[in-house]
């Protein structure tokens, strides 16, 4: 491995949908970026690695179980993490929540000292876990996650309340219990109460800051 590979630190943040993962990731990114600069830290959302469904009709796309590991292109994510560790840039895929497939455009991402990786299914894949220097599970009660998800999907993603509730009952909750919650055992740190747990965020900041020394 190259010196660059030793310098790239991968931190995984997992948890239920609407548990506060993205808030913790964005807070850590924003506050650490102010300390070390944009060139040293980046964020990769797992959502961008939902499989491309542009070949499917909209009717078929909405039937996809987005909370099952098979919906993710973890092979591509693994390839990208390994590229960053090897000092190579990647083209970060983007996902459209309204079109239910990948966008045509990508975001160019250069290797960073620290990469924060966040998503619901990260800890279910042993290959991804092996690339992480340490991992976090955001442990938020499901009823709170549902309320947050309802508000987010209706206001930001153009969903109806009925469709959000139907999806929650059919796939979100069952897949959480089958895949996501059991993956909590692999986390090095468990954060209760979601993205507004300031004490936990400060502890995580202190831990991550060690990698910049």
From Swiss-Prot:
The keyword Cytoplasm applies. One of its GO terms (cellular component) is cytoplasm. It comes from the Bacteria. It is found in: Cytoplasm. ATP binds at residues 15-22. It is an enzyme of class 2 (transferase). Its main location: cytoplasm. Belongs to the uridine kinase family. This is Uridine kinase. It comes from Yersinia enterocolitica serotype O:8 / biotype 1B (strain NCTC 13174 / 8081).
């Amino acid at each position: 491995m190259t010196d660059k590979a030793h310098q790239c630190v991968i931190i995984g943040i997992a948890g239920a949908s609407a548990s506060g993962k993205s808030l913790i990731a964005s807070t850590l990114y924003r506050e650490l970026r102010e300390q070390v600069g944009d060139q040293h830290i980046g964020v990769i959302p797992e959502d961008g690695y939902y499989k491309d469904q542009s070949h499917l009709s909209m009717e078929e796309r909405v039937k996809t179980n987005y909370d099952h590991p098979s919906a993710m292109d973890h092979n591509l994510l693994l390839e990208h993490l390994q590229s960053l560790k090897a000092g190579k840039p990647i083209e970060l895929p983007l996902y459209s929540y309204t079109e239910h497939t990948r966008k045509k455009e990508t975001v160019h991402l250069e290797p960073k000292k620290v990469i924060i990786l966040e998503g619901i299914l990260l800890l279910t894949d042993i290959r991804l876990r092996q690339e992480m220097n340490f991992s976090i599970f955001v442990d938020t009660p499901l009823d709170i996650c549902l309320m947050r998800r309802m508000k987010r999907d209706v206001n930001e993603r153009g969903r109806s309340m009925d469709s959000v509730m139907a999806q929650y009952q059919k796939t979100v909750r069952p897949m959480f219990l089958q895949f996501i919650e059991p993956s909590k055992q692999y986390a090095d740190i468990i954060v209760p109460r979601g993205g507004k747990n300031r004490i936990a965020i400060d502890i995580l900041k202190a831990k991550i800051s060690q990698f910049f020394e």
